[in-house]
C-alpha cells in the first residue's frame, strides 16, 4: 500500500463535486521540492514546459497550453477557433461552456450559441448535429453560420460513443467547421472504454483537459491543438489575466496527478456504479445512465425535495450532497458511499408518503438549469 492509499482525506464524504479532491502529501512534496521557478509567461519554466510536453505526448497534439482552469481553457480555446463574426457555436443544451462559464461565449467570443437537446436524451449524435447546423453558404443570411461544434465527453457522466465522434469529426472537416472538446472528464471516458486519450483527441481540432477534477491536482487545465492555434490561444489567455509567473509548483503537482492518480479513477466509477445499482434495485429513477463517476437522480420523477436530501445527508448521514447530482471520486470512503445510499432511500420513502411538489425554485440551480424547455 502506498503512502497516498494510507492517507485519510478530508474529502471522504464529499459528493458535491470531484473538484473537492485535495492534493495528497506526495503531490505537495513534488510541488514544492521538485518544481522549477522560471517565468512561464516568458515560457522559461522548465516544469511547466515539461507538463505541456507530457500532454502533447498523451493527446498526440503538437502544442499545449497550461491554464488556471477548465473555464479558461474552454473559453480561450473556443475563441481561438473563431475568426470573424457572424458565427455560432453548436453544443449540447447542458454543456458546461454554455451554462456554467458565466456567459463567457457571449463576452469573450461574442458568439451566438445554438444549444441542442439530444434526440436520445443522453448525448449528441451525428444526426442531431446534421439537423441543427447552420451552413455558411446556403443563401440564407438570417442565421449565424455554425463555425464551431463543441462536444463534452463525458457530459453528466455519459460517454459519447467513439463512432458518433468519428462521424461528427468527418462532417466538420468536410464543411470547414472547427470541432472542440470539453474534455474535463475525458480521463474518465478513457478509463471506462479503454480508448486512449490520443485516439479521442485525434478527432478534434482543440481539446481542454482538466487536471483538477477527477485527477485531484489543486489547480489547472491544459488546452491542446496545433502550434498556430495554441499561439493564438495564448494571446487570449494573457488578455484574460491568465498569465502565470512561477507556475512550476502547480505544474509539478499536475504531473504527479497524471502519473499517480489516473489509475485511481476506476475506483470512482465503482462507487458511482454502486449508487446507481442501488437506486435501480429500489426503484429510484435516474436521469441518465451511470457510465462513469456521476449519478443524476430524477428528483421530479421521484417526487423528492433536493433540499431535504441535502439536509438529511448533512444532519444524519454525514455526507455532503448537492441535490440531484452525486459526484464520486477516489478520495471517498466506502462508508460514506453506503451512507449516501441510505440517505437517498430514506428521502424517497419519506416522499412516497409526502410527495414533493416542485415549485420551480430549484430550476436555476447548478445542474438543474434547463435552458430549453420541452
UniProtKB/Swiss-Prot annotation:
One of its GO terms (cellular component) is cytosol. One of its GO terms (molecular function) is L-allo-threonine aldolase activity. Pathway: Amino-acid degradation; L-threonine degradation via aldolase pathway; acetaldehyde and glycine from L-threonine: step 1/1. Keywords: Lyase, Pyridoxal phosphate. CDD domains: TA_like. Pfam families: Beta_elim_lyase. Its EC number is 4.1.2.48. Residues 354-374 are annotated as: Disordered. GO terms for biological process: glycine biosynthetic process; threonine catabolic process. InterPro entries: ArAA_b-elim_lyase/Thr_aldolase, Low_specificity_L-TA-like, PyrdxlP-dep_Trfase, PyrdxlP-dep_Trfase_major. Its cofactor is pyridoxal 5'-phosphate. Gene3D superfamilies: Type I PLP-dependent aspartate aminotransferase-like (Major domain). SUPFAM superfamilies: PLP-dependent transferases. It is an enzyme of class 4 (lyase). PANTHER family: L-THREONINE ALDOLASE, L-THREONINE ALDOLASE-RELATED. Homotetramer. Belongs to the threonine aldolase family. This is Low-specificity L-threonine aldolase.
Amino acid at each position: 500500500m502506498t503512502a497516498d492509499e494510507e492517507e485519510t482525506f478530508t474529502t471522504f464524504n464529499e459528493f458535491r463535486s470531484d473538484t473537492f479532491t485535495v492534493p495528497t502529501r506526495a503531490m505537495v512534496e513534488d510541488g514544492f521540492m521538485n518544481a522549477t521557478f522560471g517565468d512561464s509567461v516568458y515560457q522559461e519554466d522548465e516544469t511547466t514546459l515539461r507538463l505541456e510536453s507530457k500532454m502533447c505526448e498523451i493527446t498526440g497534439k503538437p502544442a499545449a497550453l497550461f491554464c488556471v482552469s477548465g473555464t479558461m481553457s474552454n473559453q480561450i480555446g473556443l475563441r481561438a477557433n473563431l475568426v470573424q463574426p457572424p458565427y455560432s457555436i453548436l453544443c449540447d443544451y447542458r454543456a458546461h461552456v454554455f451554462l456554467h462559464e458565466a456567459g463567457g461565449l457571449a463576452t469573450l467570443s461574442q458568439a451566438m450559441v445554438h444549444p441542442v437537446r439530444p434526440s436520445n436524451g443522453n448525448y449528441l449524435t451525428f444526426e442531431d448535429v446534421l439537423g441543427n447546423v447552420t451552413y455558411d453558404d446556403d443563401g440564407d443570411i438570417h442565421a449565424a453560420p455554425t463555425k464551431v461544434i463543441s462536444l463534452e465527453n463525458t457530459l453528466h457522466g455519459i460517454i459519447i460513443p467513439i463512432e458518433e465522434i468519428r462521424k461528427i469529426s468527418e462532417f466538420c472537416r468536410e464543411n470547414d467547421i472547427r470541432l472542440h472538446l470539453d474534455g474535463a472528464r475525458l480521463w474518465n471516458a478513457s478509463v471506462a472504454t479503454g480508448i486512449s486519450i490520443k485516439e479521442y483527441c485525434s478527432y478534434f481540432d482543440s481539446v481542454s483537459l482538466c487536471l483538477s477534477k477527477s485527477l485531484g491536482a489543486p489547480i489547472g487545465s491544459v488546452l491542446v491543438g496545433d502550434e498556430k492555434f495554441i499561439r493564438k490561444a495564448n494571446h487570449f489567455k494573457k488578455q484574460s489575466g491568465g498569465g502565470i509567473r512561477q507556475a512550476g509548483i502547480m505544474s509539478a503537482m499536475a504531473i504527479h496527478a497524471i502519473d499517480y492518480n489516473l489509475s485511481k479513477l476506476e475506483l470512482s466509477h465503482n462507487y458511482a456504479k454502486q449508487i446507481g445499482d442501488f437506486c435501480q434495485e429500489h426503484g429510484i429513477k435516474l436521469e441518465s445512465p451511470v457510465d462513469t463517476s456521476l449519478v443524476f437522480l430524477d428528483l421530479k420523477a421521484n417526487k423528492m425535495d433536493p433540499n431535504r436530501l441535502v439536509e438529511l445527508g448533512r444532519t444524519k448521514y454525514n455526507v455532503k450532497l448537492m441535490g440531484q447530482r452525486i459526484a464520486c471520486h477516489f478520495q471517498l470512503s466506502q462508508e460514506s458511499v453506503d451512507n449516501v445510499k441510505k440517505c437517498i432511500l430514506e428521502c424517497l420513502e419519506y416522499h412516497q408518503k409526502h410527495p414533493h411538489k416542485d415549485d420551480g425554485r430549484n430550476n436555476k440551480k447548478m445542474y438543474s438549469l434547463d435552458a430549453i424547455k420541452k
